[in-house]
């Protein structure tokens, strides 16, 4: 009933998220390589007449890249987004968006001057109505076509360098599934040749900033779709879990009794269709995923013990947080003692040494789900993806608060393609740099309930010894206060008496030795009888 009501009531809400704006998918925009749509508020490109932004040339980073990708000019994602556009909206102040029609993260209001902090909460701390609303929002997004964005179904070359646009509509939820596919897909080299050692969002420094932006845009999209400006993505704290405790019909879907690889018919998500999962087919055809439905969600948690013998523990997380280096060595999945590589799951959470034979931390959850979520390109089809990555982001945030790194700690050069600090993140339009999200979540308008609680605990632990010491000397303090009060009263009385005596002496000393002139003459001319 809740879902039906939401669908009927909110179907007309317009949305905006990330990737190819519908307004920039024409042959004119592609051939002119310009994406500067008009803002509806004043009908000028980028809201320029209202001072919101301007259409400007894109300045690309010239920092050298790592050796992992040896080609140039073979992939549309290289030097993003220059293959498609070299001019986009550059927004001013707190404005943001492909036409500068939105506010930067953390700002609200018609002029983006109101600053607010939203809090992401543990999904198990949500009330039943809150949890049901979250599930309904997910399903609404799955059934609402994005009015503002489309997905390309061919490369720029296959579009005849923009003269023959190839784009499809897509629903709001699947837009983000497609983006996660596109950022991590293989490079199509022509014929039947591909290059697999490439990923613009994983296995390198940009893993955490990219997924941070992905969640922020997804969150913003749901806020606009539903009109619920207070919506935040809940997180799943999987530390020390013995099983998938959110894999129930009450939450993210239980087992189908007839087929353990499918979801229960009673689940919100049992009827969902997945996209972008046939990678070998796309590669063999040298084609992109076109958003065609490919069957139901698959999930059978905990049945690949060889690669994932257990879920991550609290000790594993604490070891990650203790690592002082964000990135190290080759800055890829072979990096040792790297916080990013250990949290991502390519290095052991016991030693910090890269280990290709095991999947730990973030990777462990994907493998543990044993289904759609276990394949990188299609993993965002499973809504557990959002809850999982929200918790991964909270660990990233905890590391930032513990170590207080300068932005310069994020690698400026020699990272794998797409991962340098000043590189624009694929496939987002408007444009965002990796380094822009190597900052505290509070500067982006959100926090985590578990981090707020832990900070209060840290403060209480800090002052606890002082409070205990104060409790031991409390009787003495009371006695001292009483004695002090008596002494203060006595001293005050003595001081008052001394002051009065002093004032009397001063009055006598201040009497004039000679009379005033008038009094003197009056006395002088007095007659005597």
Curated annotation (Swiss-Prot):
Its cofactor is Cu(2+). GO terms for molecular function: metal ion binding; tyrosinase activity. Pfam families: Tyrosinase (PF00264). Changing residue 302 to R: May be associated with burmese coat color. It is a single-pass type I membrane protein. GO terms for cellular component: melanosome; melanosome membrane. Residues 496-529 are cytoplasmic. Glycans are attached at residues 86, 111, 161, 230, 336, 370. Glycosylated. The chain crosses the membrane at residues 473-495. The keyword Glycoprotein applies. Its EC number is 1.14.18.1. Keywords: Copper, Glycoprotein, Melanin biosynthesis, Membrane, Metal-binding, Monooxygenase, Oxidoreductase, Signal, Transmembrane, Transmembrane helix. It comes from the Eukaryota. One of its GO terms (biological process) is melanin biosynthetic process. The keyword Transferase does not apply. Cu cation B binds at residues 362, 366, 389. Forms an OPN3-dependent complex with DCT in response to blue light in melanocytes. Belongs to the tyrosinase family. This is Tyrosinase.
């Amino acid at each position: 009933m809740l879902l039906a009501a939401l669908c009927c009531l909110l179907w007309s809400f317009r949305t905006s998220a990330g990737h190819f704006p519908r307004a920039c998918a024409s042959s004119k925009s592609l051939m002119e390589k310009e994406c500067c749509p008009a803002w509806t508020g004043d009908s000028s490109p980028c809201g320029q007449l209202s001072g919101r932004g301007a259409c400007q040339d894109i300045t690309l980073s010239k920092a050298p890249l790592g050796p992992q990708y040896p080609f140039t000019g073979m992939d549309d994602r290289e030097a993003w987004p220059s293959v498609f556009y070299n001019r986009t909206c550059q927004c001013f102040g707190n404005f943001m968006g492909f036409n500068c029609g939105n506010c930067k993260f953390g700002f609200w209001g018609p002029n983006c001057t109101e600053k607010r902090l939203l809090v992401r909460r543990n999904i198990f701390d949500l009330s039943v109505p809150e949890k049901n609303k979250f599930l309904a929002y997910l399903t609404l997004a799955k059934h609402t076509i994005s009015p503002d964005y489309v997905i390309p179904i061919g490369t720029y070359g296959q579009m005849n360098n923009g003269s023959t646009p190839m784009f499809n509509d897509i629903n709001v939820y699947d837009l983000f599934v497609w983006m996660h596919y596109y950022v991590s897909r293989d490079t199509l080299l022509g014929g039947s040749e591909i290059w697999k050692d490439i990923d613009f969002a994983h296995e390198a420094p940009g893993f955490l900033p990219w997924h941070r932006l992905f969640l922020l845009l997804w969150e913003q999209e749901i806020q606009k779709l539903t009109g619920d400006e207070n919506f935040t993505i809940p997180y799943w704290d999987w530390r020390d879990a013995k099983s998938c405790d959110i894999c129930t019909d009450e939450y993210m879907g239980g087992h189908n009794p007839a087929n353990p690889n499918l979801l229960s018919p009673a689940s919100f998500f049992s009827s969902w269709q997945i996209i972008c999962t046939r990678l070998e087919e796309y590669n063999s055809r040298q084609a992109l995923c076109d958003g065609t439905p490919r069957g139901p969600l698959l999930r059978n948690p905990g049945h690949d013990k060889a690669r994932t013998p257990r879920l991550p523990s609290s000790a594993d997380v604490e070891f990650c947080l203790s690592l002082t280096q964000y990135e190290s060595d080759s800055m890829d999945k072979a990096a040792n003692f790297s916080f990013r590589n250990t949290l991502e799951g390519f290095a052991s959470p016991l030693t910090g040494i890269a280990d290709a034979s095991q999947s730990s931390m973030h990777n462990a959850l994907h493998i543990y789900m044993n289904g759609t979520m276990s394949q990188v390109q299609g993993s965002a089809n499973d809504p557990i993806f959002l809850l999982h990555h929200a918790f991964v982001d909270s660990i990233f945030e905890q590391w930032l608060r513990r170590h207080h790194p300068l932005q310069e700690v994020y690698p400026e050069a020699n990272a794998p393609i797409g991962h340098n600090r000043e590189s624009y993140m694929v496939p987002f339009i408007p444009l965002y740099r990796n380094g822009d999200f190597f900052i505290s979540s509070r500067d982006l308008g959100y926090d985590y309930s578990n981090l707020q609680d832990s900070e209060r605990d840290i403060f209480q632990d800090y002052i606890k010894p002082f409070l205990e010491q104060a409790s031991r000397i409390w009787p003495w303090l009371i006695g001292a206060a009483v004695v002090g009060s008596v002494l203060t009263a006595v001293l005050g009385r003595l001081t008052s008496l001394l002051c009065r005596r002093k004032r009397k002496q001063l009055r006598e000393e201040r009497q004039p030795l000679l009379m005033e002139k008038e009094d003197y003459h009056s006395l002088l001319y007095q007659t005597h009888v």
